[in-house]
Amino acid sequence: MEKSKRLFIKSKRSFRRRLPPIQSGDRIDYKNMGLICRFISEQGKILSRRVNRLTLKQQRLITIAIKQARILSSLPFLNNEKQFEKSESTEKITTLRKKNRN
């Protein structure tokens, strides 16, 4: 029996605890865009609590702040970076066409 018990003992690995994403001095507010943008995906979705590693209360406050910022138009509902990239590339093409015509 002693041999079978020894098989299941795991070695203790040391691990480094990550810093919390929200420090004690950070204020969760819809005006704090630098903080809010860290918790939004590339598509503009609010990241889950497991991904953010936040407490339930912090996640609730972040969600409310993001929704307020979206309603007040300081944050887009969808992330439109790809649309801006396309518009810039089309501007380059049109300027090249105009140069070729002259």
Swiss-Prot record:
It is found in: Plastid, Chloroplast. Keywords: Chloroplast, Plastid, Ribonucleoprotein, Ribosomal protein, RNA-binding, rRNA-binding. One of its GO terms (molecular function) is small ribosomal subunit rRNA binding. InterPro entries: Ribosomal_bS18, Ribosomal_bS18_CS, Ribosomal_bS18_sf. GO terms for cellular component: chloroplast; mitochondrial small ribosomal subunit. PANTHER family: 30S RIBOSOMAL PROTEIN S18 (PTHR13479), SMALL RIBOSOMAL SUBUNIT PROTEIN BS18M (PTHR13479:SF40). Belongs to the bacterial ribosomal protein bS18 family. This is Small ribosomal subunit protein bS18c. It comes from Phaseolus vulgaris (Kidney bean).
